[in-house]
Curated annotation (Swiss-Prot):
InterPro entries: Colicin_E_sf (IPR035900), Colicin_pyocin (IPR000290). It comes from Escherichia coli. Belongs to the colicins ColE2/ColE8/ColE9 and pyocins S1/S2 family. This is Colicin-E9 immunity protein. Keywords: Bacteriocin immunity, Plasmid. This protein is able to protect a cell, which harbors the plasmid ColE9 encoding colicin E9, against colicin E9, it binds specifically to the DNase-type colicin and inhibits its bactericidal activity. One of its GO terms (cellular component) is protein-containing complex. Gene3D superfamilies: Colicin E immunity protein. It comes from the Bacteria. GO terms for molecular function: protein domain specific binding; toxic substance binding. One of its GO terms (biological process) is bacteriocin immunity.
Amino acid sequence: MELKHSISDYTEAEFLQLVTTICNADTSSEEELVKLVTHFEEMTEHPSGSDLIYYPKEGDDDSPSGIVNTVKQWRAANGKSGFKQG
């Protein structure tokens, strides 16, 4: 999986693939998973970081698409760039 430099370099579908890979722990090693989680935290800039995945708030949609929607809504509400169109 190619890691991009900015969340705006990802389409929503590409970012969903990243989140799905993390949620399913579909990596060849623990080291690779940690790298993806760190990348998720850096790209989203969300104050909850990886807790969105591993320790979601009660009632939150903790599916990969729910996590992506949470990130998208938070970034929009905080004046941050969104996903690349396409």
